[in-house]
Amino acid sequence: MPNIRILTETDLRKVIDLDQDAIDCVQNAFVALATKDVRMPPILRLDIDDYNGEVDVKTAYVPGLDGFAIKISPGFFDNPKLGLPSVNGLMNLFSSKTGMLEAVLLDNGYLTDIRTAAAGGVAANHLARKDAKHATIYGAGVQARLQLKALTLVRNITSATIWARDLAKAEACAKKASLELGTPVSATTDGKDAAANADIIVTTTPAREPVLMADWVKP
């Protein structure tokens, strides 16, 4: 039997953070996807409509790498009402040479959170104005704070706004983000006003109806 390493979320948090290395790693993955014969099948998605949930299974193989991962990522969007996170999951790492399981990453969605935020940082680095100062985030969950942090890694963000339908949630997120980043962060439930002065806008909600209108965005 192979020696299978099991890493918990606590283990992973000790060695992986949302930093410039994470952004560079995700950018390198995008470059590989565009320039190499990457094998990436369509996402397998299972909808659990009864509980406002879905499960996504994702994988890819980059030629030349010794391993590949398969990610199982449930998203149950009523979970916050139960005091649970909306997203969790795990990843299994396999040998590219033998197909043998080498590691189980019990990250509870942490690696997905980091990867998603880092991708936002990559996008902002290539698309946002160099002099962008004010960021607006639509959403007030974990990803909202992480996206804002990612923006601060690629631009000199001096202020930010958190929008949410629930003002208390927006205020809680804004307070936590401000303490983490040392940047003034305000909260609002006015989506139009939130967009008015934004240099960068990021949406981080699972909303199925629009929360941002095109005519709100300044040129």
What is the predicted role of each segment?
Residues 1-113, 119-121, 128-131:
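N-terminal ligand-binding/catalytic initiation module
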Residues 106, 140, 165:
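Cofactor-binding loop segments of dinucleotide-utilizing enzymes, especially the Rossmann-like FAD-
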Residues 115-136, 142-154:
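Short internal alpha-helix immediately C-terminal to a glycine-rich phosphate-binding loop
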Residues 133, 158, 199:
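Conserved acidic residues
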Residues 136, 160-161, 186:
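A structural signal for isolated positions on well-ordered beta-strands in alpha/beta enzyme cores
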Residues 148-149, 174-175, 213-217:
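Short amphipathic alpha-helical segments
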Residues 153-181:
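NAD(P)-binding Rossmann-fold cofactor-contacting core
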Residues 182-219:
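Rossmann-like adenosine-cofactor binding region
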